[in-house]
């Protein structure tokens, strides 16, 4: 018998095809008499669903119908509801409450949610999936990414798993949103949809995922999960209008992990900045594909001034990577820290030049 590894495109139609979403997976396999065999348990762990073997008929029956319920059952214990009174001294109405959703990221009571959920919330109460109530404390908050950390006094909580490779998320991939829409009595509501779009900037400083899974008030801070039960995003916002349907947005897992890493290590996001006020081209503003550079409106840091950058220069690239919008620049700078040096390529006085620029710390938050 020969032990091999196969990479199979798992598109078997219907729900299963949605589960695979075009991703390939590597599974240990063996070749017996020229036929390739894999363990059913290994296959199910990748594509979900259930399978049973009938020893009498020697038939193996696969059922994809349990994929979504299984994912919801797996993830829901890691989802919490968050409620509190708005911190408004003029609000005396006892029914004046704000609520949202959160995701457990550490078993000792650390919960990630949206900054806009808890920024003005007083006397935070967190309710876990088993109905237990805890007093919550806002620990870190980052308005730029719209993410925050809340702490409760609890142990042995089930943590959610962030997508191991968030960059493999694809348009058309099935996803599930879990949260607390509209009313606190609707905790752990699940809605199903697909990834509708990638790299959406909308009104965010970073790229967002677009989904048609129903996102309603109160879903903010809850997880958007794939059919492996991995969190691919944190639900954040939606477009609302009489002529608009099913346009929700989530903060991608890579941005969530970036912010969490900074929260844990620094207690805040140490966000780098070029120290420049930049204006996007008309094409970039309206969302057209463009290679037009951004224009320097003002120099706002001493480091940028020392580098010789001046108003009117046009920024083409940073470290050799073209940037045509503020979001593209912000995404690129996630790999850097204040104090590090980058190469900036600019058109200045008719000449295309590259300068060394020391990154400043952004004060945007």
Model-assigned labels for residue ranges:
Residues 1-65, 76-77:
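Primary recognition of N-terminal secretory signal peptides and signal-anchoring hydrophobic helices
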Residues 57-93, 101, 123, 170, ...:
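N-terminal activation segment of mature serine protease catalytic domains
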Residues 63-70, 86-110, 114, 132-135, ...:
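A conserved glycine-rich beta-strand in the N-terminal activation segment of trypsin-fold
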Residues 67-72, 227, 231-287, 353-355, ...:
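C-terminal cap/linker of serine protease catalytic domains
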Residues 77-82, 102, 109-113, 136, ...:
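Terminal peptide-recognition signature
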Residues 86-87, 106-185, 205-207, 321-327, ...:
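Conserved active-site neighborhood of the chymotrypsin/trypsin-like protease fold
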Residues 88, 214, 264-332, 340, ...:
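PDZ/PDZ-like groove recognition
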Residues 89-97, 117-124, 157-159, 178-193, ...:
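Active-site loop architecture of trypsin-fold serine endopeptidases
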């Amino acid at each position: 018998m020969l032990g091999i590894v196969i990479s199979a495109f798992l598109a078997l139609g219907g729900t299963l095809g949605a589960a695979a979403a075009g991703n390939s997976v590597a599974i240990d396999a063996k070749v017996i008499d020229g036929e390739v065999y894999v363990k059913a348990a290994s296959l199910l762990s990748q594509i979900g669903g259930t399978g049973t073997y009938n020893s009498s008929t020697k038939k193996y029956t696969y059922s994809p119908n349990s994929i979504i319920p299984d994912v919801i059952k797996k993830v829901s214990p890691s989802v919490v509801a968050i409620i509190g009174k708005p911190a408004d001294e003029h609000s005396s109405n006892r029914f004046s409450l704000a609520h949202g959703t959160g995701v457990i990221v550490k078993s000792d009571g650390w919960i990630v949610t949206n900054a806009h959920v808890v920024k003005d919330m007083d006397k935070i109460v967190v309710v876990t999936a088993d109905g237990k109530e805890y007093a919550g404390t806002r620990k870190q908050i980052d308005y730029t990414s719209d993410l925050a950390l809340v702490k409760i006094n609890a142990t042995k909580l089930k943590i959610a798993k962030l997508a191991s490779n968030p960059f493999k998320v694809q348009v058309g991939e099935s996803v599930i949103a879990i949260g607390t829409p509209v009313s606190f009595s609707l905790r752990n509501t699940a809605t199903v949809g697909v990834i509708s779009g990638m790299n959406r900037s909308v009104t965010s400083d970073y790229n967002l995922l677009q989904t048609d899974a129903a996102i309603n008030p109160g879903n903010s801070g809850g997880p958007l999960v794939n059919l492996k039960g991995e969190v691919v995003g944190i639900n954040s916002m939606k477009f609302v209008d009489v002529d608009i349907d099913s346009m929700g947005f989530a903060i991608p897992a890579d941005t969530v992990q970036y912010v969490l890493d900074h929260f844990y290590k620094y207690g805040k996001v140490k966000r780098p900045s070029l120290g420049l006020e930049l204006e996007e081209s008309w094409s970039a503003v309206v969302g057209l594909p463009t290679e037009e550079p951004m224009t320097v409106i003002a120099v706002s840091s001493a480091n940028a001034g020392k580098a010789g950058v001046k108003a009117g220069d046009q920024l083409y690239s940073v470290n050799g990577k073209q940037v045509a919008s503020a979001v593209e620049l912000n995404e690129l700078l996630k790999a850097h820290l204040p104090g590090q040096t980058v190469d900036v390529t600019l058109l200045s006085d008719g000449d295309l030049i590259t300068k060394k620029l020391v990154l400043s710390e952004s004060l945007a938050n």
